[in-house]
Amino acid sequence: MELHHIRDIADPLTRVIKDDPVRPHIPLEQRINQAAEILLLKAGEEILAATCLQWLTEIPKNEEDLKTVSNSKNVAVFYTIWSYSPGAGAALIRQAADWILKEHSEVRDIVTLSPQTEMARKFHLKNGALVHQTNETSVNYRYYHKAATE
């Protein structure tokens, strides 16, 4: 299984967004820009899972916060995830988090912007996340936090 990055809106693999069960209304141009990309978990040519990643300076509380385009890579936010194969969503989160920590030393937090559903809660807690905060319409699950150095 390999992690694949979609960073060009002309990439034919962007077709996967039609299957987004969480935030299907978010346009492609918001999913892929200087501060956002789509990550896929693939086995050969087969797509096993997909997630959308947004880079921000602060942990978002709602979808509106995702519209901030920043050059900062302090906070990595997974704001939707879906899979086509059992266990692939969990594997994608693990591989994506490993890649973020390896390639982006400046990252302070790896979090989600998740719906307030039991399915999301079970998925993220089972995969090692902690509840960071509950917002009016969402929950942030935290997969990584770099403690401030004194």
Where are these regions (language model features)?
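A generic local structural motif
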Residues: 25-27, 63-66
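Short, small/polar residue-rich loop motifs at catalytic or cofactor-binding pockets
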Residues: 33-35
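Residue-level detector of beta-propeller blades
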Residues: 47, 130-133
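Non-catalytic surface loops within mature trypsin-like serine protease
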Residues: 55-57, 116, 145-148
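Acyl-donor binding region in acyl/amide transferases
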Residues: 64-128, 136
